[in-house]
Amino acid sequence: MKNRIVFLYASWVVALIAMLGSLYFSEIRKFIPCELCWYQRILMYPLVLILGIATFQGDTRVKKYVLPMAIIGAFISIMHYLEQKVPGFSGIKPCVSGVPCSGQYINWFGFITIPFLALIAFILIIIFMCLLKGEKSE
């Protein structure tokens, strides 16, 4: 039981940090999110609420709702990161108006961009959900 709570709690903390980081970049640093950033937000923000409730109730059944959202979010993050870093992918135009998806507001150590941070968060959530091993809540 304790391991389940630890993995749920860790997933919730990751989602919460990702959401707060996203809000920091847009509201404090005034970075305008592109279209793909919005899709990643749409998939990450509800995870804070879903995982928060599941954590405090000790409900591991939430895995079946969280995993699809995290996997889709990871794929969007990968596509976004490739568009930023690989010249061949920059021809893909998912962003039709506003801020270009190929723009890089941050580029820490030459490879850490905002989509990369989102990808790490989604991957950590996927790993923690997989470590729940399908245990049922009582």
UniProtKB/Swiss-Prot annotation:
Disulfide bonds join 34-37, 95-101. Disruption phenotype: Cells partially restore cytochrome c oxidase activity in a CcdA-deficient mutant, possibly because the bacteria can no longer oxidize the two heme-binding thiol groups in apocytochrome c. It is found in: Cell membrane; Membrane raft. One of its GO terms (cellular component) is plasma membrane. GO terms for molecular function: protein-disulfide reductase activity. Required for the stabilization, possibly via formation of a disulfide bond, of the obligatory competence protein ComGC. Not normally required for production of the secreted lantibiotic sublancin 168, although it can partially substitute for BdbB when the latter is absent. It may also be required for the stability of other secreted proteins. Not required for sporulation. This is Disulfide bond formation protein C.
